Amino acid sequence: VEVEAEGAWSGTLRLSADGRVWEREVSLAAGLQTVELDAGLEQPRLWWSRGLGGQHLYTFRAELLASGRQAAARQARTGLRSIRLVREKDEWGTSFYFELNGVPVFAKGANHIPLDSFVTRVTRERYEHEIASAALSNMNMLRVWGGGIYEDDAFYELCDEYGILVWQDFMFACSLYPGDEAFLANVRAEAEQNVKRLRNHPSIALWCGNNEIDTAWSHYLEDAGWGWKKNYSPELREKLWADYEALFHELLPEVVGRLAPEADYWPSSPMQALTRDANQHAGKRTSSGDIHYWGVWHEAEPFERYTLNLGRFMSEYGFQSFPEARTVRSYAGEREMELLSDVMLSHQRHPSGNKLIKRYQSMYLPEPKDFVSFLSVSQVLQGEAMKYAIEAHRRRKPFCMGTLYWQMDDCWPVASWASMDYFGRWKAIQYYAKRSMKDVMVSIDGTKEGEVDIHIVSDVPEPIDGTLHAALYDFDGKLLKRFSAQAKVEANATAVVWSSSVDGLLEGADPKRTVLKADLAADGRVLDSKLHYFVPAKDIKLSKAMVTIREVAGSNGTAFTLETDTLAKQVALFAEAEGVFSDNWFDLIPGIPVTVEFLGRGAAGRAFAPASPGRITVQSFADWIEL
């Protein structure tokens, strides 16, 4: 217990929690000091991240008493857990994963930026909407990006409650910083204040020195980095690097080690390790440390590169889309609804972002019939890109043990990498992420030429003994083939449970009008389902689908069943009310209905609860392209 006393003082320190009380006599001197008190809980309830267990929180209260009267008191709500960043030599290089209460955790989530450009406008409700959305999307980690802010207490309290681990950057990003004594003293005070403020939150998993500065400067590789070094003489380079090391290799780790000795510190994201040689800096594909992979998007590489360029922990990667039309119309009039209008370019912070979205759309998806349709198609494109990445990362477990895409939220209404727009409306990618981050996931991999592999990825601590049921359909819903296979997966592991050549699977069926459906069943229920197509989406032969929607009897207008007469791709439901559907932006096969529930934002005093969506608009690719 840390105590600051104005002068000498003697009395009793009392600590209480969960009905237990511990006391000791203390004598304090003037100034700041730490007093230790042994306290033990028999059979404590541990704090777990979402998906591994409950998020039990204890309230510890400390009091200073003199003659039975309270002189000072403070309480903290915290969870009991052990967490460490495991970096150990293995068959591939050096591991990089988090171990919570002795259990290896595959980190699934996104990067968090400030929720508003004007942070005073952010409310607890907005924080809860984001963090509840992360939990509902099967995430277990958010990375607080070093180019933003040290977040409000409410953010961390909610991460504690929802079981979302926090990778916490110190607030340094994409720039070099001074190393003079006055600046370092200022940084030390800021770091100490924030480490003390946040160290009792069980959600804090890691302290990271900065965002991308190590890789941007790449001190030990002359031709690497972002080109900064060429602007400086050798002498000035050494001075700048010495300043960098003083801040990120000395000051910040010392603060963390002194004030939060059980916490881990990582100097910069991304990097391989603190080796002080050329092996320190991260690349596109490394066997140690973490990676920010931007070949897809910034360098216009194809989605398929996600399966090749990965490492031990993917802490940043992403792809842009536009928000839905309702959000775009909050900043653009009808005359400005064009890809390269001044308003659209002003609401795009990447120098060629809108053109890049269009370029990728031409590579992978059919041509939208107008700009409003392009908005929806761009969201499908983003979702497909992130599905490619997330599932590639998860299939490579335990080599890869983390996937955090850029980014979860937006600070203003804009075309961006976010999975929720400024108003908190889920884009298609949020539903894609929810499906691709399920604790038990079916992943169908068609990236090998002429082959299809079906993987089961499990993040649960128990083995799975189930059955894979798969079927081949044409787009009219005709069953072409059915087969099954045993699906056994060890606890917290992955397995390929079925493989086939494409030719052997199709047996002459038209690849442009055929879909594979795979379901994993165990203990009498379906754990996950996935669809797979045999040609890119732009090449499949779609017909005009008639999608019907009906209310589920007895649901009080909160649940709905959808059916179609021919394959409907990317069925998107838009509700009048603010909220989310249990599933959305999915494909419908004739004869296989899908039932969804609407969860209203803030309904029944909760972040999400069943509610009426009001008017529902149903769209699909058939509405966005010319057929």
Q: What label would you give each PLM region?
A:
Residues 1-141, 283, 395-396, 400, ...:
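Secreted/periplasmic carbohydrate-active enzymes, especially glycoside hydrolases
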Residues 44-45, 69-175, 183-206, 345-383:
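Active-site-adjacent substrate/metal-binding segments within catalytic domains
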Residues 82, 112-114, 146, 211, ...:
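Residues that line or immediately flank small-molecule/substrate-binding pockets and catalytic motifs
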Residues 86, 114-117, 149-152, 173-176, ...:
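Flexible loop/turn segments at secondary-structure boundaries
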Residues 131, 195, 253, 379, ...:
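Generic hydrophobic alpha-helical scaffold/packing signal
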Residues 156-158, 181-182, 221-224, 280-282, ...:
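Short, glycine/charged-enriched secondary-structure capping and boundary segments
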Residues 161, 177-275, 423-424:
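Active-site neighborhood of glycoside hydrolase catalytic domains
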Residues 207, 214, 247, 251-464:
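Substrate-binding clefts and catalytic carboxylate motifs of secreted carbohydrate-active enzymes
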